[in-house]
A protein has these predicted regions:
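Conformational coupling and interaction surfaces
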Residues: 15-19, 23-26, 31-147
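Class I SAM-dependent methyltransferase SAM-binding "motif I" and its flanking Rossmann-like core
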Residues: 1-9
């Protein structure tokens, strides 16, 4: 899940619906792997993608709009880190810490308590952000093979 700011803070995906975030944090029946704001914030992607000679790409078109609005070095990759881990797993890209995620107030601030018996994991940078940007952007630029 792309949610939270670690070890504590306030992040949009939590505070945009604090009651729902609290319910998920307290009642979700399985382990949640949190990719916090700090993980994707320094991973800039999209610059090479928008320069590709490909037409009718909704991903390229969306990134082109971001660049037009002032992201000349690329777009932060918060959600993309969560997708990468969901598809490929966190190894070898990230270390993890086990603990408990909590929504601590009605404004949607969160906290993290490290605990070897906690039900959640949070990602911790292992591969430098610049290398992660190359890896993620290469996946974004992949073109389907024609049959």
């Amino acid at each position: 899940s792309m949610a939270g700011l670690f070890p504590e803070g306030k992040e949009f995906n939590v505070y945009c619906d604090t009651p729902a975030s609290r319910v998920v944090a307290e009642r979700w029946p399985t382990e949640i792997i949190f990719s916090g704001f700090e993980i994707g914030n320094m991973i800039f992607t999209g610059k090479k993608l928008v320069q590709m000679d490909v037409k009718d790409s909704p991903v390229k078109d969306a990134y082109s709009l971001c660049f037009a609005e002032g992201d000349p070095n690329g777009r932060m990759s918060w959600d993309l880190t969560a997708v990468l881990v969901a598809v490929k797993g966190y190894e070898p890209y990230y270390n993890v810490e086990r603990g408990t995620f909590r929504v601590v107030n009605d404004e949607g601030a969160n906290s993290w308590t490290p605990d070897g018996k906690g039900k959640d994991l949070r990602l911790i940078e292992k591969v430098p952000a610049v290398e992660m940007a190359v890896l993620i952007e290469n996946y974004m630029m992949h073109q389907p093979v024609s049959k």
